[in-house]
């Protein structure tokens, strides 16, 4: 084949891939510059059905795609060139696999004759993500390979996708056509003649039925299950699962609803949100130990005390509801797992428990803790928990909340306030890394342009400074709240043998501030050390059409000392 025909066919395959992905539900494509992925890049540049996002750092790009997929509930495509560009996606792919977020990696690659021979920027890319992505290896574009094969390969890999797929795309040079004029997928092209019908409509070439394997108990099984003292636990749930239905379910059965930070229900007034603290409250814990059946929605619980409670209790019946088959119980309890959407399961024909309202006293204990937190956190010294509670109480219906790992998400889980409504809440708690948090929040903010707040620690932000580049491109409010306690102060809560080891090998104090970083990326910046200034800056930032930074300066020991003091009060209640 002449070289010009090679470039044209490369581009045509790229266009077929991007068009079919758009028909399969992809709305966003995240792209990093590179030469070997040129057929995909040029095709994406002409694809009007996809919103394009560009970033030079593939690690941040992968996490941005993760955020876009979380917020949209749809697969997101990622285009990279060959070599370590692909490897830099690994952390985001791991997180997406563990949390069932659909990402589609389209990696440009060298042809077979340039692999394993010292050719430039060539590594073994197939299976680079090991067990964390479904692998599809495309051959180099060839006129002897029917275009239908390409489409059916994509359809089989992507339809009903709930986890990452890696599609490795080999291209021979030349990669750049001599001109870019007209439509790439020209219906007059002899190569595309078998796709005339496909070109005339907007449906995928192969249309798969939904592969949902929903399961539900019989009425008799439900009646037996609710006959006793039980609890309902809301773990990690997405907004699409409509977790609000669990409130009505708990009220109908007459069992308490215990809520995790990631349930979308942590602040609901009808839920027992302070469960982490109640499990060290002597009277509350004694009451909870009377339960002999449990209904868990989702998994990946944050509270170690709640995880231990599930592990130590002698359950007569343990039901868990998950949207797809998974193993999300580190205590390995004997249980019945039902595959269903949380809202669907909550709307089954449930009966009133024979022990309805058995744990009503928990409401009193929960309210006592709420009053304690108002007195000792909201009205106490300035600190991280105070800031997090202030954020959670501000315009919850108007914004989205992304909570960073390490100390921020734990403070929210322990001390979030009760409120009439809760912001849609996101986390990265699959692998629970501190990398890519800003990039993920940028993706969440970029999908619909809804005001978004990111609560992030100083080390997490240092880990993802490059993603300020993504943040500055946003045209909707993204408030980046950096809790700067000068190091990894979650280690203050852990039993490191002595303070010298803690300081030298765990906390890693750095003495850095973020004002110059914000200035480098031309982002509005404020540094605060009291609640009044924070609230003033925060309200202003929520109205700013773009990203802005608020750095909260706190001492290394403020949060850990406050946690210890509150724990002592709760244990003595």
Swiss-Prot record:
Keyword Phosphoprotein: no
Domain of life: Bacteria
GO BP: menaquinone biosynthetic process
Catalytic activity field: isochorismate + 2-oxoglutarate + H(+) = 5-enolpyruvoyl-6-hydroxy-2-succinyl-cyclohex-3-ene-1-carboxylate + CO2
Presence of the UniProt keyword Transmembrane in the record: no
Pfam name, any one: TPP_enzyme_N
The enzyme's E.C. designation: 2.2.1.9
Cofactor binding notes: Binds 1 thiamine pyrophosphate per subunit.
Pathway annotation from the record: Quinol/quinone metabolism; 1,4-dihydroxy-2-naphthoate biosynthesis; 1,4-dihydroxy-2-naphthoate from chorismate: step 2/7; Quinol/quinone metabolism; menaquinone biosynthesis
GO molecular function: 2-succinyl-5-enolpyruvyl-6-hydroxy-3-cyclohexene-1-carboxylic-acid synthase activity; magnesium ion binding; manganese ion binding; thiamine pyrophosphate binding
Cofactor: Mg(2+); Mn(2+); thiamine diphosphate
InterPro entries: DHS-like_NAD/FAD-binding_dom, MenaQ_synth_MenD, MenD_middle, THDP-binding, Thiamin_PyroP_enz_TPP-bd_dom, TPP_enzyme_TPP-bd
Entry keyword set: Magnesium, Manganese, Menaquinone biosynthesis, Metal-binding, Thiamine pyrophosphate, Transferase
Function of the molecule: Catalyzes the thiamine diphosphate-dependent decarboxylation of 2-oxoglutarate and the subsequent addition of the resulting succinic semialdehyde-thiamine pyrophosphate anion to isochorismate to yield 2-succinyl-5-enolpyruvyl-6-hydroxy-3-cyclohexene-1-carboxylate (SEPHCHC).
Self-association state and partner proteins as the record states: Homodimer.
NCBIfam families referenced in this protein's UniProt entry, alphabetically: menD
Protein family: Belongs to the TPP enzyme family. MenD subfamily.
HAMAP family: MenD (MF_01659)
UniProt-recorded name of the protein: 2-succinyl-5-enolpyruvyl-6-hydroxy-3-cyclohexene-1-carboxylate synthase
Gene: menD
